[in-house]
């Protein structure tokens, strides 16, 4: 009876105790806990593993050999073991992601600047006037507000400066244009002139603006007239860059053209050149302007010639022999932007016109010389792009590769620098440079080889992988440095100042350029082999006779009382 009462009590348990996933949690709580195996039950591993573990699977013949173990130890349910396995899987996946992703020199500060894309090498024209969003650039918006308030200043100089600055900022918001118009109507003569210039540069070629320009050109002195012409040229430049369907008509154009032609007939100077440029925007096919600009190519200064070339090549499409010769002369300009723009103009002229003019040999020799005489890598790369467009690159590369074997040091160095900009065609040249790096005795040539290899590696992943563990030595002139105590030595601020004497203790980044440091009076040479290889051991004479008696004698000596303490060390 008692057992029946207990069963009845058990079945009378209210159903409110049954909750969701109760059985699952009960099963989980009653499951046995598998602790890590003891040291006696852990499966043993054989070292070294058999060669079978390192063989490549037939389905992946090109895969990198790695260790494959079929027998894996039992998985433990202990949370620490599971956490370690998860971290190991994540590290493996991260490793393969990095392996598949192309390696770039992220640790080196100089590598990203070695190779520049051609889109960055092209000089883009300045953007025309536009609107400004106050949310994107609040500081510039605040500057605009301050300048517009400066137009209402009681001092004339502040008003002139505000009008001048608003024109150069190139922002044509409504409140800016209204403030400039108000000052142009109510201000003094000096302020009016600056306001009209700013309005013209912001794209407002109204009747009153052009009328004010004509008045200034007729009345002002030469210095003030030059400033007016420069402002008019800037306004007409932005006007000429507009699409034809959106380009407005210039009021009083005929009167302005006649006035500019009268200024051209004067002797060649900055004023007449600016007038010719303004007239070139209004009348691109005017023969008078073309003759004046062609005359400027032979008589003017380098900066004046460059201004004339821009108008002739880009606006008037004049590609004569005189223009080509002037472009080649601009490759020797002291201004880096002019040299860069000259390479682009040669691409605009094209190979066919250069051949028709009979200037192929002159162009070839000059571009070939510019490949190694140019001090900046960016310009050398731009020259390489121009040589490629003009279909001269294969011949120049062939000549430079043959010049690598020249006995003259300067010829070898010129070829190495040129190939750094031209690139590499086959592996033989790469291996030849590596051999030259080891065999070359001239330090300047060695440095050029190192720079060429670094430039190649910055744009060629194959060369980059080949040079990953390569360490370059840059030799410096020995300096008399007072040795200090290790405790008081200053840490080098940059890796270039680091002096590595023992590479076994140094963490080498890819293509890390180290400096070989030597004392006065000592000659330091690069080691013949890397420190990562073990040093060859001294050859010992082979043991003769039976070896068992010798071992027994050593064991007997170890058991002696005076040597018994050795076992406890």
Curated annotation (Swiss-Prot):
InterPro entries on file: ARM-like, ARM-type_fold, HEATR9
Superkingdom is Eukaryota
- Note the SUPFAM superfamilies from the entry: ARM repeat
One GO BP annotation is:
hematopoietic progenitor cell differentiation
State the name under which the record lists this protein: Protein HEATR9
């Amino acid at each position: 009876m008692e057992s029946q009462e207990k069963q009845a009590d058990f079945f009378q348990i209210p159903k409110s105790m049954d909750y969701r996933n109760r059985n699952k949690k009960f099963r989980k709580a009653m499951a046995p806990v598998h602790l890590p195996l003891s040291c006696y039950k852990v499966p043993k591993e054989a070292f070294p593993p058999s060669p079978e573990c390192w063989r490549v699977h037939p389905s992946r013949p090109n895969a990198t050999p790695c260790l494959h173990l079929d027998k894996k130890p039992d998985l433990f349910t202990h949370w620490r073991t599971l956490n370690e396995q998860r971290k190991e899987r994540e590290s493996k996946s991260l490793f393969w992601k990095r392996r598949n992703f192309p390696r770039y020199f992220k640790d080196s500060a100089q590598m990203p600047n070695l190779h520049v894309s051609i889109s960055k090498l092209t000089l883009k024209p300045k953007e025309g006037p536009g609107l400004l969003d106050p949310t994107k650039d609040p500081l510039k918006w605040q500057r605009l507000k301050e300048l517009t308030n400066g137009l209402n200043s009681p001092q004339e100089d502040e008003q002139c400066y505000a009008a001048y600055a608003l024109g150069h900022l190139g922002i044509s918001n409504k409140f800016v244009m209204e403030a400039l118009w108000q000052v142009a109507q109510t201000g003094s003569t000096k302020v009016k002139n600056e306001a009209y210039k700013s309005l013209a540069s912001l794209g407002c070629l109204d009747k009153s603006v052009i009328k004010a320009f004509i008045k200034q050109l007729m009345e002002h002195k030469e210095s003030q007239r030059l400033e007016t012409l420069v402002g008019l040229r800037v306004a007409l430049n932005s006007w000429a860059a507009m699409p034809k369907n959106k380009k407005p008509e210039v009021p009083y154009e005929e009167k302005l053209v006649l006035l500019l032609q009268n200024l051209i007939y004067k002797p060649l100077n900055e004023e007449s050149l600016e007038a010719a440029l303004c007239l070139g925007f209004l009348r691109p096919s005017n023969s008078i302007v073309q003759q004046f600009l062609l005359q400027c190519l032979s008589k003017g200064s380098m900066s004046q010639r460059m201004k004339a070339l821009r108008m002739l090549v880009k606006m008037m499409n004049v590609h004569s022999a005189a223009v080509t010769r002037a472009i080649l002369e601009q490759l020797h300009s002291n201004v880096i932007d002019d040299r860069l723009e000259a390479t682009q103009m040669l691409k605009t002229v094209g190979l066919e016109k250069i051949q028709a003019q009979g200037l192929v040999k002159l162009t070839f020799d000059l571009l070939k010389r510019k490949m190694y005489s140019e001090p900046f890598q960016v310009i050398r790369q731009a020259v390489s792009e121009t040589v490629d467009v003009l279909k001269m690159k294969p011949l120049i590369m062939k000549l430079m590769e043959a010049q690598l074997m020249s006995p003259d040091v300067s010829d070898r160095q010129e070829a190495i620098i040129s190939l750094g900009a031209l690139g590499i065609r086959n592996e033989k040249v790469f291996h030849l440079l590596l051999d030259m790096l080891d065999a070359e005795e001239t330090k300047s040539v060695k440095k050029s080889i190192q720079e060429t290899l670094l430039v190649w590696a910055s744009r060629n992943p194959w060369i980059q992988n080949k040079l990953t563990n390569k360490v370059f030595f840059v030799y410096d002139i020995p300096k008399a440095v007072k040795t200090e105590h290790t405790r008081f030595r200053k840490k080098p601020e940059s890796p270039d100042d680091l002096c590595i004497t023992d590479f076994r203790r140094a963490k080498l980044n890819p293509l890390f350029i180290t400096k070989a440091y030597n004392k006065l009076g000592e000659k330091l040479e690069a080691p013949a082999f890397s420190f990562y290889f073990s040093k060859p051991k001294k050859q010992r004479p082979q043991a003769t006779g039976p070896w068992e008696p010798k071992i027994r004698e050593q064991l007997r000596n170890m058991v002696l009382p005076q040597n018994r303490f050795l076992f406890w060390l």
